Amino acid sequence: KATLNHNLLVDRYYLDALEQGGLGRTVADLPEIGTPAALRTAQAAQDRRLTAFCDRLEASDLPRRVDTDRGRPVPERIDHLLAHLFQHQIHHRGQAHAMLAGTGVAPPQLDEFFLDYDRHPSVAELGLLP
């Protein structure tokens, strides 16, 4: 639960910076989410928000800088923030997947999203199909 809450917190922090929402580090003041179902719902909403942000981007937006809150404003390129955010997601989602694999709980599908062969049904739910 701690890993998934951390992942959600970091997603919120960076997406707020990308959208110039002004919350900055105060996103850490949001309460932890206590149940797996509520975490799933919150993460899915955050994923949809990130997808919508990316859908609105133009190529000319990528080198533009937005401020991140590090106790002081630190400008970062949008493309660099997105790359960092995606890497962070991959790392911690993989970490949670590995933890579940060591239990009796079947971890979610993480592999087959883009190829036609063995594509997982959740691809359609996520709007990843062309």
List where the protein language model places each region:
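Short polybasic amphipathic segments
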Residues: 64-68
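Helix-adjacent hinge/juxtasegments
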Residues: 21-63
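Short, contiguous alpha-helical
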Residues: 1-29, 69-130
